[in-house]
Amino acid sequence: MSDLKAIQARSLEMAEYFVAFCKEHDLLCYLCGGGAIGALRNKGFIPWDDDLDFFMPRKDYEKLAELWLQYADERYFLSKSSKDYVDRNLFITIRDKETTCIKPYQQDLDLPHGLALDVLPLDYYPKNPAERKKQVHWALIYSLFCAQTIPEKHGALMKWGSTILLGLTPKSLRYRIWKKAEKEMTKYGPAESDGITELCSGPGYMKKKYPIQAFEDNIFLPFEGTEMPIPVGYDAYLSTAFGDYMTPPPADKQVPHHDAIIADMDKSYTEYMGECNARKN
């Protein structure tokens, strides 16, 4: 198993490639969550953080999926669920095929189990309260039928309802339902909206509303000897999402949030596939 520093080094390497790719193709991206906080508070990783995540406006996010297949280094695999491929995520992940990072919820899947960089889309938040309720409704449907996984951390009622819905829905229909939901939840534009929201980050974050201006551009800040982008309106975003983001959490909360069955930054996941397959049985 690789240590935290090795994982951070590979994560930074991936992030540098990703940001350079976005620059080359005129795509807007910014660090989000702990990566953005680390850029401001630590000029690098939060010491206990083990990954970097990015936001992209929806239109750039959709372009990324097309451009990556044409122009990106084959070492980095873009994973995005489709009709015949489900990775149990709600968003794009970029996977480094020269590394290994096997997550419990994906260990039985046939996909590149390399270290992941998460890329999450941002969508418009409609002004009309009734439309906003519809958007959240569709986002929850999208979350269930795209991930095709029973949520374990959002209460017994949601777990029970999700189990029934998935159980009653044939696999052949799940893709059609989630594509319908995705279309409905992302149909709003700036004219009918007064905010930006996260629809693919889970039920908690889809309740958030950020100023549109916060994500109109990015700024680059020092980050581990290089520079990384964060939203131009980072304070409005981070204070809404996390409150007093410049104050570190208590010591008992300063731990990595992501678990991995195997994490090896020096070997490709292909060298572990036998072990991974054994865990399925």
Predicted regions and their residues:
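A short secondary-structure junction signal
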Residues: 129-134
